[in-house]
Amino acid sequence: RVVELGGWNPLVVSSQRFTLHTRDGRVYPVISGSVPPHFLRASGGASSLPSVSDIVFDAGFANQEEANAYGVFPGDVIIPESETILTANQKNVISKAWDNRYGVLMIRELLENVKNQELNNTLIAGANVQEEVGLRGAHVSTTKFDPEVFFAVDCSPAGDIYGNQGKVGD
């Protein structure tokens, strides 16, 4: 059984490769199953979408004892296999969770630019979670550190992709 950490779209979780990370540092490949289309019919024939809890994640272990023998226990995490790549023309980057990666990159750039500067204040940088569902991570950070100034770095999905209304850049 898998419990979601953060927001997961079941439409992109099905039939994907993942890596299982054990608490003692071992890593194993995992594949997620997909619900066959004919099982996606709700009562009355209407289509229904699976939830992440409906999806099977398979690391190839025959049973719990075998998984335990390989150091796999409840609470170990699986993460999607994901590669960040350049497009053919080398002008754009393709990646999942781009908003998170972009935010961390901007924080890294900031820290690189101020690392040799004498600051008149304390600079604290961090990466937070669950901004889509109430800024929970940012709330914890601001409560714990009580900053005088707080900058959140994030971005929104692009609205200028092929087929959308409006012009490129809107």
Residue ranges with predicted function:
Residues R1-D170:
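N-terminal hydrophobic/helix-forming segments and targeting peptides
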